[in-house]
């Protein structure tokens, strides 16, 4: 059976997702959905022009909701980056009103298409929007996943790697909670060179607070520099999609609705063909557990506020 992935929204992030998927040969068939007909048609032709120079071939159809019925994965990149660029508060809720209004129509179209695969959400504020997609579509919660702090964790790994002169892939551990200002690095989970980082930090000149701030603010450095973020978050979504397509049973820190939290937030889960296959349990410190609950409460509050306006 052919592997199929849909992408809703072909802006900067959606195009980066499409390029990464197609270049890596993750699927055989792709469905591009975007309100800008000229743009999505141009992307279709542009990628078709690239096929002769790629190792993998991909078939692309555009703006055909019915074609999503048998898609394995759909990735939503809805948003309006201009709202974030003009946002003086430095959080990811500037796009909430705009994106939440789109979720209603897009979620309805997605449900009516007969899609029954795994929905991966990038759109900011991602935890609230992921919860809203699940609310609007009625899809099982385990089949609706947000990229969450998978990107923030990668930023933490980069910062820690730089501090220790290591490849970021040699750093393990997680950022948890909201993909936003209430997120935190769960330092009790972070290990470097086979040791807990807190042990190494106590013994050396390592400023964990500075590393955490770098992870939290990294996205805004990119946003201020080029006007948007794309490659980091696109790669996060692709990693989730690949875990689903391969039924990898991979442990990834994604925005998911845990039974003990009752709301979407980022916490490691086992990801495979059916989305979230199992929950994990981290041995967090008391302080980390309190931060997680505070982050959960904030996401819940913002979700309740937007649901009341629908």
Curated annotation (Swiss-Prot):
<keyword id="KW-0521">NADP</keyword>
<feature type="binding site">
    <location>
        <position position="155"/>
    </location>
    <ligand>
        <name>substrate</name>
    </ligand>
</feature>
<dbReference type="InterPro" id="IPR018177">
    <property type="entry name" value="L-lactate_DH_AS"/>
</dbReference>
<dbReference type="Pfam" id="PF02866">
    <property type="entry name" value="Ldh_1_C"/>
</dbReference>
<dbReference type="GO" id="GO:0006089">
    <property type="term" value="P:lactate metabolic process"/>
</dbReference>
<protein>
    <recommendedName>
        <fullName>L-2-hydroxyisocaproate dehydrogenase</fullName>
        <ecNumber>1.1.1.-</ecNumber>
    </recommendedName>
</protein>
<comment type="subunit">
    <text>Homotetramer.</text>
</comment>
<feature type="binding site">
    <location>
        <position position="124"/>
    </location>
    <ligand>
        <name>substrate</name>
    </ligand>
</feature>
<dbReference type="InterPro" id="IPR036291">
    <property type="entry name" value="NAD(P)-bd_dom_sf"/>
</dbReference>
<dbReference type="InterPro" id="IPR001236">
    <property type="entry name" value="Lactate/malate_DH_N"/>
</dbReference>
<feature type="active site" description="Proton acceptor">
    <location>
        <position position="179"/>
    </location>
</feature>
<dbReference type="InterPro" id="IPR022383">
    <property type="entry name" value="Lactate/malate_DH_C"/>
</dbReference>
<feature type="binding site">
    <location>
        <begin position="34"/>
        <end position="55"/>
    </location>
    <ligand>
        <name>NAD(+)</name>
    </ligand>
</feature>
<feature type="binding site">
    <location>
        <position position="92"/>
    </location>
    <ligand>
        <name>substrate</name>
    </ligand>
</feature>
<dbReference type="InterPro" id="IPR001557">
    <property type="entry name" value="L-lactate/malate_DH"/>
</dbReference>
<dbReference type="GO" id="GO:0004459">
    <property type="term" value="F:L-lactate dehydrogenase activity"/>
</dbReference>
<dbReference type="Pfam" id="PF00056">
    <property type="entry name" value="Ldh_1_N"/>
</dbReference>
<keyword id="KW-0560">Oxidoreductase</keyword>
<feature type="binding site">
    <location>
        <position position="124"/>
    </location>
    <ligand>
        <name>NAD(+)</name>
    </ligand>
</feature>
<comment type="function">
    <text>Catalyzes the NADP dependent reversible and stereospecific interconversion between 2-ketocarboxylic acids and L-2-hydroxy-carboxylic acids. 2-ketoacids with medium chain length (five to six C-atoms) are the best substrates.</text>
</comment>
<dbReference type="InterPro" id="IPR015955">
    <property type="entry name" value="Lactate_DH/Glyco_Ohase_4_C"/>
</dbReference>
<comment type="similarity">
    <text>Belongs to the LDH/MDH superfamily. LDH family.</text>
</comment>
